Amino acid sequence: MRKLVVPNVFFEEAAEALREGKSVRLHVDGQSMYPFIRGGEDEIEVVPYDGVTPPEPWCCPFYQWGGNYMIHRFIGMNGEKWRMLGDGNLYRIEEVPQREIIGLLRTIYHTDGTEQDCRDSRWLRRAQWWYRLRSIRRFLIPLFRLLRI
């Protein structure tokens, strides 16, 4: 199977649709949100963000940072900036102005046919625990990949 890398211009179009109030469904690549999102396999639904509502703890905003569009976990605030960390990342925290937040992750569509509502309180609590395990993620992530968890 040939891998197709979609240029960032596609995500610009998705961002524009979100700004127009439309939801978008995207096939994601990359491993920065593993194990919650499997890059190259899962699809996600992103809904528009109103630009006003305070973020729900552990939600996953869609935003532009460093010229790229991303979905990472919201982990807190630093003044007016939202702090983000990918579930598969160990150290790099992005600080994003609220005006750069375009949408919020609503649903993950897994390849096995299951769907994950990203507003579900149990899912958000699991994300919080995963964040607390940052110090041992370097060992857990390879183990999870090996076991296909």
Regions found by a protein language model. Give the residues of each.
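Extended hydrophobic leader/signal-anchor segments used for secretion and membrane insertion
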Residues: 1-149
